[in-house]
């Protein structure tokens, strides 16, 4: 393909033919090779094959083992053959030596991982994968590494199998990413500079900087500088070719005099040195006298003579004055003790001056004589490095004990400065260092350990769990169940091992609380759930029936008074014992009492008298002796009772009337008998057969068929003993207070430390008549009188226990830095046990506070500067050769002493000021000794004050001094102005809000409880609060100032509302429903309805019903007694004979009776109820048809009950019932069968029974409980095999197993509301100044919500803005241009100032310069650097030099990313230096431009894209732009660069035609192209647009206007710029052509035709009219009701 693409014309064709021939040849050779292989493979081959190596075997670990493998001969097709078929010489070995690995080798061998190699593109490994033409995100690659098993100790390689035994071999390859090459990105060029020369040939340049370095093999950075020549004009005269160049200042040297003195003293002995010093001193004094004499003679002015006379007078002062002056000087020297740290020696330094040609070569100095030579010397301070002393010994370790937690102390050592650096000497090293330490030596005690302690838990409170609408809030007495209790946690010093038991809660043993910060562990919980046992109410059974009249005491029957008693039992174990139960016995006085009586068990069969077969007879009673409680006793006890007599009866003869047995006595009509009421009982019997005429016993009349007797004849006066509550337990002094005595005194009581003594309790017992009140005690049975006194246990007294007072809190500081607020210190003690049972009360005072002692002012430090010394000049011997120099005047250097002072003016060590007083003042400064011709002026005065703001001016002045007043040159006010004027400041301020509104904050101390109750969960803050917005104040120059300038306190306040939480509101519980079953186990239900959903963080609703989301159910099982409602049948009515034999009164007949459903009671059925309450299947018959026996017929009793079917039910089993003959038949007749049988059929008359267990009920709590421990129940149900529930007795009679637990405890989760701590104090402002400062306060979750408790608020922190304060800071000005004083080029200085700036701290505000006084409180640092540098050396290039610019600022940090996704190669930033030159001929001598990069953090992602400008003719601008809007060079892919030039061939010369970007002629906007047949533009025609007139148009004609959006050209057809019509409707003049009108007319005619035909086809033919018939029905009009079916 490459060959074909490079060969043009015929070359391409011949190459294609050769390629075809080559492929044919390959195909031929391939077929030949296949044929050859086929021939060769016809002969079978045999090869050796091997299996895997087996396990290494050996007697010892390590080398020397052996392993084997299987070797066999196989055919090439895979089947095994004999060994002889394979070449024996090629047989592989089946055994080899190996290394036997043991477990302990794991410590000796390990994998050694090599470094990853360079990332290699996948395309290089896979030759078939082409590399992408355009790199987008990078190229996938693979990198490898070497991995081998080595011996750990010496790194010797070992077999990989050893390491693989323990761990698989790590991977050898991994995927990697080769990032796309990143070209260097540079900024736009700066504007061209001015010409480097004012005349002649010069240079202009423009610069750019590097924004992103080349990465990953990207193209290098282009030139950062562009030059072009310039020539402003011809130079007049000869152009200067030479320039003076100054070199750098040399090393500071001592003056020759000092040097000679120092050198001489070093060689001369001490005595000679002393003599020499005396001689020099005499010479100096003589020299001074000569100089003073000369000066005296030279003095001309009167003022100098006056000063000289003053000095002479001073010399003549008295001795006392001289002594005072001497002491003052001594004191000053002592105050200037800092002088010993600075050995300031003023020396001099020189520099070299050369003359250079503009070509860069050095010339003779004479070539630069036309220029003034600069000064080559200056005074300086001889450089000395910092000198420090040796380190002091380490201080004692700050920790004096052994810390069990391993924490260490600190120890420090220091060194002193002996010589501070001067003259640019080396700075001082660190003067203090510290290190962690532990105390050394023996007998070091362990450190004090602090532990958390807690008070006892408070009483359990249930009220805090009540919801808002709980009705129990109004009456909280008796609440029980789950609750919450709290305690206080405090920190104490843990007791030492030698101390006694301090854990007990004794007053003297309680530990002193300390600061909580000393305890390191997690503090104990301060809240926990608790449980108050709910009182178990006493449950009693129903009253039993009234017993017989019995003696009060059967042992004493002397009195004739007796009582009838009824009793009830206690059904449970009530709280507090049975003493709180209601009375269990009621008594009624009666007459003729007896303790024992005969009970008639039954009457025997009727035996006729005189051994007859029928007729009158007697029934003997069967009796048993019973006591008053109905219990069977010995018959001898009833010897005094009246034995029941035999009862008269009659055995009916065949002709006698037959009566049924008497029914049972009915219930007594009244429970007692009185004046107006008497109890009656009835019983009845019926006629079963009539007598036979005259021969038999006649049937009685109807009145004889019923009997009535009196019952409950006792009076209606019921008495019982009523007990009052037990009184207070009073100590019984007769019983000793020992535990054993307690156990004896109160039987059944376990020994408990909580009880200390035995007491007695009494209660009131009275006799009460029901419904009347108290009566005399004799009315009640004395034997049943409850006890009035009982022993009791007295609980031990428990005193209040408090901790000792804590130590006084330390005063906030030992000194006051300002402010008059008195500091306070406090101490507290904590109640750890509340008093109980009459113990000692707690003290009232638990917190004490007192003022701190008056503290002194904090000992601050400050630098004190002393007077400047005289100005020292460079020695005259050095200066005398310099032109214009004078011996006594010129520039010099002066020094001063600096000392350290306390703020109270006392002296202090210099080290204190170095540490606390900020930077040290300057020690030296340049000075000028004025020469005679110099002008001398005073310093500027302060500006005068302004009378008012914004009015007038203010001035400052200075004056000439000395002879300068007389010199004319000094009177030139332009050179030496004596006054300056400026306008008075005009301060105008305006305030405006800034920032967001704060959170809504309640006023301090405002906590609203819900519903007026301050209980748990109700301490939510809600109600009206305020939110704040900061105010900012600006002056007239829009500079930030203090808010007080705007008369503002810094905030805008606005009222706001914090909504109070509202809990879920449910209705009260409904009444329990009736049990779902009338027999057996069912369920009963009660419910609550949702009244209001929670909002604003209130308690959530409990789980609602899944069907109806607005209801809460509670379901419990219930048991209905199957015998509580019974059918009661009245006696059968008289027979109604249907076929009456008037003679015999017998035959077929009907009997009826009433059957009623009645409620069953202890005494029997009582009140009738609705029939549906009784089981309809068990309802007795209300009518029966039968045959009334005729005389002499056999009369049988009614059928008895059916016998039970044997279980299990079986069709082979039967049941039967029987009847007995009451009247024997005559001899001619027989009795029918007296038994009846039927087959036992399952679920018909035979049933199986089984227990069924109900589901557990919901957890049931006491009505006084909210949550906590409750109980759940379930019940047994006896179920018949036909699924009908029956009485439990059916299952119990069968002895079925009951293996289920009917009751179980359960827990209802307590709805614990979230508990939050109080708000903390407001924090410090997050910013010390600026607009963004915030104050925060926080609270924490003390108790998370549980169950349906109120959830925690999401607002755990609040903020409000800080008052806005201006941000003041010191900033540098820009460096001044480099200036080499006195020369055109060379070494010079540049300067900058440090000024005070104000900003808003946002970083977006550049800041404004303000008075330096506003930064007076700030340490003079710039960007954290305390070393202020206001001048530095620099180089001014000479005209013949080419040099590098200063480094640019570091570029913004930039990430390597694509489309905003970080590629993971880090961030980088770059800076660069460009090349500058001033002479064109020196460009070849320029150095290389430089750039350097460094990694950075928090880089930004930038995208680059091409931007284009509008076409101007055939060209347009194309540039690359970064995503932040910066125009750059590089960064955009060159393959996607848009074209910047376009041209069409042939040229587009048609009107309104343009050359498109595709190089094809097109039309301007609003015009369409008309093309020739060969695709060339013929003309540009206006596109017609139909304009529809609107109501506001005055003209309604159709206009043809230019289109606003003409059809854009498409690239569908080559050679055409866009789509055009084949038939053009417009002519060359823009009007419609004639054929267009014809087409329109034809279309209109066709439309009219289609409409007409459609009308005719759809029109229905007209029907003939008929006469309407009068009897025709009118249609029914139906009203539409909205139903869709209508």
From Swiss-Prot:
Positions of transmembrane segments: 1636-1656
Signal peptide segment: 1-36
Region (Disordered): 257-321
SUPFAM superfamilies for the chain: TSP-1 type 1 repeat
A biological-process GO annotation: actin cytoskeleton organization
Gene encoding the protein: thsd7aa
Basic and acidic residues bias (residue ranges): 259-272, 294-321
One Gene Ontology term, aspect cellular component: plasma membrane
Bilayer topology: Single-pass type I membrane protein
Keywords: Angiogenesis, Cell membrane, Cell projection, Differentiation, Disulfide bond, Glycoprotein, Membrane, Repeat, Signal, Transmembrane, Transmembrane helix
Residue stretches making up the TSP type-1 domain: 44-103, 107-181, 183-236, 385-441, 448-535, 537-596, 656-717, 718-797, 799-859, 860-932, 934-985, 988-1061, 1063-1123, 1124-1191, 1193-1247, 1248-1311, 1313-1368, 1369-1439, 1441-1502
Gene3D superfamilies found in the cross-reference section: Thrombospondin type-1 (TSP1) repeat
Function: Required for normal sprouting angiogenesis and normal embryonic development of intersegmental vessels (ISV). Required for normal function of the glomerular filtration barrier. Required for normal axon outgrowth on embryonic motor neurons at the level of the horizontal myoseptum. Required for normal expression of notch1b, suggesting that its functions in angiogenesis and neuron outgrowth are due to decreased expression of notch1b. Plays a role in actin cytoskeleton rearrangement.
Matching PANTHER family: SPONDIN (PTHR11311), THROMBOSPONDIN TYPE-1 DOMAIN-CONTAINING PROTEIN 7A (PTHR11311:SF8)
Record organism: Danio rerio (Zebrafish)
InterPro entries, sorted: Spondin/Thrombospondin_T1, TSP1_rpt, TSP1_rpt_sf, TSP1_spondin_dom, TSP1_TSH7A-B_C
Topology feature Cytoplasmic, residues: 1657-1686
Name assigned to this protein: Thrombospondin type-1 domain-containing protein 7A
Location relative to the cell: Cell membrane; Cell projection
Residues on Extracellular side: 37-1635
């Amino acid at each position: 393909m490459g060959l074909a693409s490079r060969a043009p014309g015929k070359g391409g064709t011949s190459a294609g033919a050769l390629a075809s021939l080559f492929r044919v040849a390959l195909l031929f050779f391939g077929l030949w090779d296949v044929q050859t292989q086929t021939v060769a493979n016809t002969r079978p081959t045999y090869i050796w094959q091997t299996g895997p190596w087996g396990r290494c075997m050996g007697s010892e670990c390590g080398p020397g083992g052996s392993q084997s493998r299987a070797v066999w001969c196989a055919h090439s097709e895979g089947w095994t053959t004999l060994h002889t078929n394979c070449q024996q010489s090629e047989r592989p070995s089946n055994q080899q030596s190996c290394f036997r690995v043991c477990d302990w080798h794991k410590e000796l061998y390990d994998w050694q991982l090599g470094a990853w190699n360079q990332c290699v593109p996948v395309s290089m490994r896979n030759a078939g994968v082409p590399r992408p033409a355009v790199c987008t995100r990078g190229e996938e690659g693979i990198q490898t590494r070497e991995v081998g098993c080595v011996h750990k100790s010496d790194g010797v390689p070992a077999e990989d199998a050893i390491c693989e035994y323990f761990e698989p071999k790590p991977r050898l390859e991994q995927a990697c990413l080769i990032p796309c090459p990143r070209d260097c990105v540079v900024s736009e060029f700066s504007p061209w500079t001015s010409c480097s020369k004012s005349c002649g040939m010069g240079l202009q340049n423009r610069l750019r900087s590097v924004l992103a370095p080349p990465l990953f093999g990207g193209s290098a950075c282009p030139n950062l500088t562009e030059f072009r020549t310039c020539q402003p004009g011809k130079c007049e005269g000869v152009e200067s070719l030479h320039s003076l160049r100054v070199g750098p200042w040399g090393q500071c040297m001592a003056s020759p005099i000092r040097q000679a003195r120092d050198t001489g003293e070093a060689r001369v002995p001490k005595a000679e040195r002393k003599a020499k010093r005396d001689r020099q001193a005499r010479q100096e004094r003589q020299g001074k006298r000569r100089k003073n004499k000369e000066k005296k003679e030279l003095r001309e002015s009167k003022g100098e003579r006056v000063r000289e006379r003053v000095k002479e007078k001073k010399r003549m002062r008295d001795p006392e004055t001289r002594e005072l002056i001497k002491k003052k000087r001594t004191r000053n020297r002592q105050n200037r003790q800092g002088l010993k740290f600075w050995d300031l020696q003023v020396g001099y330094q020189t520099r070299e001056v050369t003359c250079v040609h503009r070509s860069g070569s050095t010339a003779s100095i004479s070539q630069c004589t036309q220029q003034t030579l600069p000064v080559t010397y200056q005074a300086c301070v001889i450089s000395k490095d910092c000198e420090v002393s040796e380190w002091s010994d380490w201080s004692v370790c700050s920790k004096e004990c052994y810390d069990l937690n391993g924490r260490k102390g600190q120890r420090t050592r220091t060194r002193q400065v002996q010589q501070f650096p001067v003259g640019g000497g080396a700075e001082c090293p660190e003067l203090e260092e510290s290190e962690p330490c532990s105390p050394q030596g023996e007998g070091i005690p362990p450190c004090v350990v602090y532990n958390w302690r807690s008070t006892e838990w408070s009483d359990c409170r249930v009220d805090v769990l009540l919801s808002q609408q709980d009705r129990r809030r109004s009456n909280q007495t008796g609440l029980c169940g789950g609750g919450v209790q709290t305690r206080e946690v405090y920190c104490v010093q843990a007791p030492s091992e030698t101390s006694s038991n301090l854990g007990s809660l004794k007053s003297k043993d309680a530990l002193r609380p300390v600061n909580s910060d000393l305890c390191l562990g997690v503090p104990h919980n301060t809240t926990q759930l608790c449980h108050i046992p709910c009182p178990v109410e006493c449950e009693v059974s129903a009253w039993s029936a009234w017993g017989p009249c019995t003696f009060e005491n059967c042992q004493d029957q002397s009195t004739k008074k007796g009582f009838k008693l009824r009793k009830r039992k206690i059904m449970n174990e009530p709280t507090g014992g049975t003493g709180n139960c209601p009375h269990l016995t009621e008594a009624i006085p009666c007459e003729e009492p007896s303790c024992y009586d005969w009970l008639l068990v039954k009457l025997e069969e009727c035996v006729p008298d005189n051994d007859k077969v029928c007729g009158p007879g007697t029934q003997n009673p069967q009796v048993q002796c019973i006591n008053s409680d109905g219990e069977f006793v010995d018959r001898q006890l009833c010897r005094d009772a009246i034995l029941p007599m035999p009862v008269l009866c009659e055995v009916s003869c065949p002709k006698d009337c037959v009566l049924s047995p008497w029914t049972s006595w009915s219930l007594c009509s009244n429970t007692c008998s009185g004046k107006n009421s008497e109890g009656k009982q009835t019983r009845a019997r019926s006629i079963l057969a009539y007598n036979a005429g005259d021969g038999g016993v006649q049937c009685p009349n109807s009145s004889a068929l019923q009997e009535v007797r009196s019952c409950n004849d006792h009076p209606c006066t019921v008495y019982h003993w009523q007990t009052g509550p037990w009184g207070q337990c009073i100590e019984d002094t007769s019983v000793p207070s020992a535990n054993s005595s307690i156990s004896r005194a109160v039987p059944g009581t376990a020994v408990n430390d909580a009880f200390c003594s035995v007491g007695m309790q009494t209660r009131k017992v009275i006799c009460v008549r029901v419904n009347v009140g108290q009566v005399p005690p004799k009315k009640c049975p004395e034997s049943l009188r409850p006890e009035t006194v009982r022993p009791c246990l007295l609980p031990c007294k428990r005193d209040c226990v408090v901790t000792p007072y804590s130590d006084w809190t330390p005063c906030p500081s030992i000194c006051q830095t300002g402010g008059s607020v008195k500091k306070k210190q406090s101490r507290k003690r904590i109640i750890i046990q509340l008093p109980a049972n009459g113990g000692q009360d707690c003290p009232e005072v638990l917190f004490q506070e007192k003022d701190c002692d008056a503290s002194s002012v904090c000992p601050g430090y400050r630098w004190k500067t002393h007077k400047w010394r005289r100005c020292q000049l460079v020695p005259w011997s050095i200066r005398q050769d310099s032109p214009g120099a004078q011996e006594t005047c010129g520039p010099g250097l002066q020094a001063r002493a600096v000392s350290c002072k306390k703020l109270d003016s006392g002296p202090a060590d210099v080290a204190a000021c170095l540490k606390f007083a900020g930077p040290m003042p300057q020690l030296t400064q340049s000075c000028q000794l004025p020469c005679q011709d110099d002008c001398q002026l005073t310093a500027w005065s302060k500006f005068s004050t302004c009378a008012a703001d914004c009015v007038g001016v203010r001035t400052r002045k200075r004056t000439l001094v000395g002879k300068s007043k007389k010199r004319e040159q000094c009177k030139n006010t332009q050179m030496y102005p004596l006054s300056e004027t400026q306008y008075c400041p005009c301060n105008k301020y305006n305030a405006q809000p800034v920032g967001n509104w704060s959170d809504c904050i309640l006023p301090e101390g405002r906590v609203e409880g819900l519903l007026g109750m301050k209980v748990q969960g109700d301490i939510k803050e809600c109600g009206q609060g305020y939110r704040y917005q900061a105010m900012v104040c600006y002056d007239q120059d829009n500079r930030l100032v203090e808010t007080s300038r705007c008369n503002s306190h810094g905030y805008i306040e606005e009222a706001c509302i914090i909504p109070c939480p509202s809990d879920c509101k449910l209705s009260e519980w409904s009444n329990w429903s009736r049990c779902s079953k009338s027999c057996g186990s069912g369920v009963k239900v009660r419910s609550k309805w949702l009244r209001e959903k929670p909002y604003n963080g209130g308690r959530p609703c409990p789980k609602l019903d899944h069907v109806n989301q607005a209801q809460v159910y509670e379901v419990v099982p219930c048991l209905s007694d199957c015998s509580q409602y019974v059918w009661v049948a009245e006696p059968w009515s008289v027979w109604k004979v249907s076929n009456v034999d008037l003679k015999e009164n017998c035959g077929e007949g009907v009997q009826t009776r009433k059957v009623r459903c009645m409620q069953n009671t202890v005494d029997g059925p009582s009140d009738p109820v609705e029939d549906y309450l009784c089981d309809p299947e068990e309802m007795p018959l209300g009518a029966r048809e039968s045959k009334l026996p005729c005389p002499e017929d056999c009369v049988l009793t009614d059928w008895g009950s059916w016998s039970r079917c044997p279980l299990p039910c079986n069709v082979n089993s039967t049941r039967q019932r029987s009847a007995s003959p009451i009247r024997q038949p005559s001899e001619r007749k027989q009795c029918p069968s007296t038994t009846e049988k039927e087959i036992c059929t399952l679920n018909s008359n035979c049933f199986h029974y089984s227990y069924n267990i109900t589901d557990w009920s919901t957890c049931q709590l006491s009505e006084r409980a909210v949550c906590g421990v409750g109980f759940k129940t379930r019940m047994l149900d006896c179920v018949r095999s036909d699924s009908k529930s029956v009485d439990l007795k059916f299952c119990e009679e069968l002895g079925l197993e009951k293996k289920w637990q009917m009751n179980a405890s359960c827990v209802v989760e307590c709805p614990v509301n979230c508990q939050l701590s109080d708000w903390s104090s407001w924090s410090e402002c997050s910013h010390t100044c600026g607009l963004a400062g915030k104050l925060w306060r926080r609270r924490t979750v003390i108790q998370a919500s549980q169950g349906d408790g109120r959830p925690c608020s999401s607002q755990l922190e609040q903020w409000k803005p800080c008052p806005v304060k201006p941000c003041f800071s010191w900033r540098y000005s820009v460096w001044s241009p480099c200036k080499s004083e006195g020369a055109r080029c060379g070494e010079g200085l540049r300067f900058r100032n440090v000024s005070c700036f104000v900003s808003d701290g946002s970083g977006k505000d550049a800041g404004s310069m303000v008075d330096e006084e506003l930064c007076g409180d700030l340490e003079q640092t710039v960007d954290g650097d305390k070393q202020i540098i206001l001048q530095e050396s620099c180089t001014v290039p000479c005209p013949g030099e080419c040099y590098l610019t200063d480094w640019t600022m570091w570029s913004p940090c930039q990430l390597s990313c694509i489309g905003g996704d970080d590629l993971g190669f880090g961030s980088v930033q770059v800076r660069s230096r460009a090349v500058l030159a001033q002479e064109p001929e020196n460009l070849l001598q320029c150095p290389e431009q430089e750039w350097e990069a460094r990694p950075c953090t928090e880089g930004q992602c930038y995208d680059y894209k091409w931007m284009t400008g509008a076409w101007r003719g055939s060209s347009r601008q194309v540039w690359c732009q970064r995503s932040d809007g910066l125009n750059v060079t590089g960064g955009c892919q060159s393959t996607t660069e848009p074209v910047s030039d376009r041209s069409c061939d042939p040229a587009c010369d048609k009107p309104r035609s343009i050359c498109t970007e595709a190089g094809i002629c097109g039309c301007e906007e609003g015009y369409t192209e008309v093309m020739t047949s060969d695709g060339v533009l013929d003309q540009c025609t206006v596109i017609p647009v139909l304009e529809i007139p609107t109501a506001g148009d005055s003209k309604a004609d159709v206009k043809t206007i230019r289109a606003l959006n003409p059809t854009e050209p498409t690239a569908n057809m080559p050679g055409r710029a866009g789509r055009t019509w084949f038939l053009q409707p417009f002519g060359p003049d823009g009007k419609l052509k004639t054929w267009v009108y014809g087409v329109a007319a034809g279309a209109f005619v066709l439309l009219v035709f289609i409409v007409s035909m459609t009308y005719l086809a759809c029109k229905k033919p007209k029907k003939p009219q008929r006469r309407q018939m009068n009897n025709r029905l009118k249609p029914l009009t139906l009203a539409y009701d909205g139903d869709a079916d209508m």
